[in-house]
Amino acid sequence: MFTLKKSLLLLFFLGTINLSLCEQERNAEEERRDDSDKRDVEVEKRFLSTLLNVASNVVPTLICKITKKC
């Protein structure tokens, strides 16, 4: 009976370590996914700011040419 308890305790201990390692890997994968999302957001922000700058320069010129009040 004592050897059975030892074996079960050993299996439980090894299983706990295995689950802990899997959890760490999952967390690392989630962080990697989050990093790419952050990069996408940064790229979108850069793209939108560039687009707004171009629009702010072009729109007044277009309005001026359309209304012919330059």
Swiss-Prot record:
Family per similarity comment: Belongs to the frog skin active peptide (FSAP) family. Brevinin subfamily.
Any one annotated GO CC term: extracellular region
Signal peptide: 1-22
Name of the protein described by the UniProt record: Brevinin-1CG3
Tissues and organs where the protein is expressed, per its UniProt entry: Expressed by the skin glands.
Free-text function comment from the UniProt entry: Antimicrobial peptide active against a variety of Gram-positive and some Gram-negative bacterial strains. Has antifungal activity against a slime mold isolate. Has hemolytic activity against human erythrocytes.
Membrane-crossing segments per the record: none
Highest rank taxon of the organism: Eukaryota
GO BP of this protein: defense response to bacterium; defense response to fungus; killing of cells of another organism
Disulfide bonds: C64-C70
Organism lineage string: Eukaryota, Metazoa, Chordata, Craniata, Vertebrata
Pfam families: Antimicrobial_1, FSAP_sig_propep
